[in-house]
Design a protein with these regions (language model features):
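Acidic glycine-/aspartate-rich tracts in secreted/extracellular proteins
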Residues: 102-103, 218-220, 289-290
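Extracellular structured ligand-interaction cores
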Residues: 74, 91-93, 208-210, 269-271, ...
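Active-site recognition of the HExxH zinc-binding catalytic motif
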Residues: 96, 274-286
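N-terminal carbohydrate-binding/catalytic regions of secreted carbohydrate-active enzymes
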Residues: 31-191
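Metalloprotease/metallohydrolase-associated module, dominated by Zn2+-dependent proteases
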Residues: 226-270, 286-347
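Secretory targeting and sorting signals
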Residues: 1-29
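Structural motif marking the loop-to-transmembrane transition
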Residues: 3-4, 269, 273
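Flexible, surface-exposed loop/gating regions in the mature catalytic domains
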Residues: 134, 139-270, 283-286
Length: 347
């Protein structure tokens, strides 16, 4: 668990680089967040929910393939008691941010991610439907949702509401064996900056929205402690801003999903839809980690089904109007007669 951290942005008007003070229990440090509007006010950063690479100890639900099919109501997700609206996404909206001047608009990853989010909720999508059993506004600890409460739903219009190439350099890439990865504070500040860019400067405009911040190549390398992605939230004058940190996954190849479903060239970008989809499905059911749906051990719907390669809940393809994309399964409390399990396609 990561404790919340409080940040105050100086100034009363939009600034080119707001200077903020990060206060922790041990130190106070001045940091610059380039382009962060002062109107964002004080920022409070919350814990992230991490997706670890294949084979990382403790990442996968113990013996995932077996657990996916094992009838056990004790495995089910429970409601965390968060405020409604805002614990789940009733009308999801995605804003895609390519952060860093190293990005090229011709990089195939940029079009792959856009097409993936553009295709969801359209023809052929029986994958996001799995999430619609979850809700908000029920008692803490509930494992089911009555018909009369707000459920996870579909978007108003297209899911992908905007795309932004932010050509600010977020951090120094891998140099001389030293990996300088943007901190959770820097990533959260970029999400708030993106909210301002898209005009979402009220709490209401961010209640259902999430910002997928994609990093360019050079910010992810194999080693102890690295992750494939995470999602989190940051509180600001714009409300609570939910976001995903999505690194350039092909920097570590199959460890974060490349060719996990499709062989050869067809699977080059598998990781981006598997991991991007993992974080998306977690965010719409747990917008602010642990306020929505997770199990007694803190695992969210996609964590419980990560990297299953065979049997019930195995990763597979999702064919949409915009293309074919590799995705993983997510947890359903209603599967197996209420015992729960990992489901790729809603029945």
């Amino acid at each position: 668990m990561r404790a919340a951290r409080w940040i105050a942005a100086a100034g009363a008007a939009v600034t080119v680089a707001a200077v903020v003070t990060v206060t922790t229990t041990t130190s106070t440090t001045a940091i610059k967040f380039p382009g962060l509007p002062a109107s964002a006010g004080s920022l409070t950063f919350h814990e992230g929910d991490y997706l670890w690479p294949k084979g990382h100890k403790g990442t996968e639900h113990e013996s995932n393939a077996a657990a996916a099919a094992a009838p056990d109501p004790g495995n089910n997700l429970i409601y965390g008691g968060g405020a409604a609206p805002g614990s789940i996404s009733q009308t999801p909206a995605v804003y895609l941010v390519f952060w860093g001047l190293q990005w090229s608009k011709t990089d195939p990853v940029t079009s792959y991610l856009q097409k993936f989010f553009q295709g969801l909720y359209g023809t052929g999508d029986d994958w996001t439907t799995v999430s619609r059993e979850f809700c908000e506004g029920v008692a803490t600890g509930e494992i089911s949702c009555p018909a009369g409460v707000p459920h996870v739903g579909g978007p108003n219009g297209p899911l992908l509401k905007g795309v932004w190439f932010d050509d600010t350099l977020p951090a120094v890439p891998l140099t001389a064996g030293v990996l300088n990865v943007p901190s959770i504070d820097q990533m959260g500040a970029e999400a708030v900056k993106a909210a301002a860019h898209f005009g979402n400067t009220t709490a209401a405009s961010n209640t259902q929205s999430q910002y997928v911040v994609a990093l360019p190549s050079g910010f992810l390398a194999p080693g102890e402690g690295y992750y494939c992605a995470y999602h989190s939230a940051v509180d600001s004058n714009y409300g609570s801003v939910a976001y995903t940190n999505l690194p350039y996954l092909n920097d570590v190849g199959s460890l974060c999903g490349q060719n996990s479903v499709n062989a050869g060239a067809a699977g080059t970008y598998d990781g981006f839809s598997i991991v991007g989809g993992h974080e998306y499905m977690e965010t719409i059911t747990d917008m602010r980690p642990r306020t929505g749906w997770s199990d007694s051990g803190g695992q969210e719907n996609a964590d419980k089904c990560a990297w299953i390669s065979s049997g019930q809940g195995a990763m597979g393809n999702l064919t949409l109007s915009t293309g074919t994309f590799a995705v993983q399964s997510t947890w359903s409390n209603t599967f197996n007669g209420g015992a729960g399990g990992c489901v790729l396609h809603a029945g």
